[in-house]
Amino acid sequence: MATNAGYLRCKEERKNESFFKVVQSINVSSENKRALPHDFSRSFTDKELSRKMKIRAQWGNSWEVGISKNPRFYFMEKSGWEKFVRDNALGNSELLTFTHKGKMHFTVNIFKLDGKEMMQPPQSRSFFASSSRIKTEQEENDIKEEVVVSSNRGQTTAAESKGRKLNLGKRAAKESQSSKRTEKVVRARSDYAGASSSTAAAFTILFKQGYLVFLRIPNSVSKDQVPDEKTVFKIHHPNGKKSWNVVYLERFGAFSGGWRRVVKEYPLAVGDTCKFTFIKPKELLLVVSKP
């Protein structure tokens, strides 16, 4: 039986110490906001914590950040931390997860406010302005091209029309089969459902390495489906034998306490497609498709 490399990597990551930070512009310089969690710090010796942290991003860039201690806690030194924040244009409530790889070396996963992970360094302001201008010009050209093509297309032949109808029919049949499979899973949990599968809200997330500790919910979902306060959700396995309580933190728009247990016991692995369907206001059915 073939081994899922992503699952093994994910399983190994769970053994490593990790913590998270949410970066806002108003607290970049705050010593409290640069603190290392107490439970995390006590996993290391004073000698280890006297070293500099080496933080490595997904795209290979790295930063060194010194660690200091006050009477209450260890914290990341301002100079190194501010450079890391500045280089990555952070400060808009990004969620960062830090995973210890040994000898105070850390990998960092950065998730933007919309829930998407940063997989490359941010570009300069001039680049964005240039890109925006190019994109606008390209869109205008595309519109002009579409108008010209449409005006020159003329009447569609009977063969082309018939071919399109056949393709549409095949696509509709395929989508219908997929819809029926989804409805079957939801009906299997109908004892929990407060609404039919056709009206149930759902969202899909591709599981990444950074989701081991926290899972950020898409903004569109959190605004429409999730209470604007700390809430406990129940996540159900489709086999009906497993369920987990997970804490949703409205400040971060993410599943927090209990989420690591879901990852471990479901289990989830890097590359999995995770579909969450609301079967009650505070209950979700999690269906996972393996790559």
From Swiss-Prot:
Region annotation Disordered: where it falls in the sequence: 149-182
Transmembrane region(s): none
Main localisation: nucleus
GO MF terms held by the record: DNA binding
Positions of the DNA-binding region: 19-114, 200-291
Family matches, as InterPro entries: B3_DNA-bd (IPR003340), DNA-bd_pseudobarrel_sf (IPR015300), Plant_B3_domain (IPR050655)
Pfam families documented for this protein: B3
Domain of life the protein comes from: Eukaryota
Compartments (UniProt record): Nucleus
Biased composition (Basic and acidic residues): 172-182
GO-annotated cellular components: nucleus
SUPFAM superfamilies: DNA-binding pseudobarrel domain
Biased segments, Polar residues type: 149-159
Keywords assigned by UniProt, alphabetized: DNA-binding, Nucleus, Repeat, Transcription, Transcription regulation
Keyword Transferase part of the UniProt annotation: no
Name of the molecule in the record: B3 domain-containing protein At2g16210
Biological classification of the source: Eukaryota, Viridiplantae, Streptophyta, Embryophyta, Tracheophyta
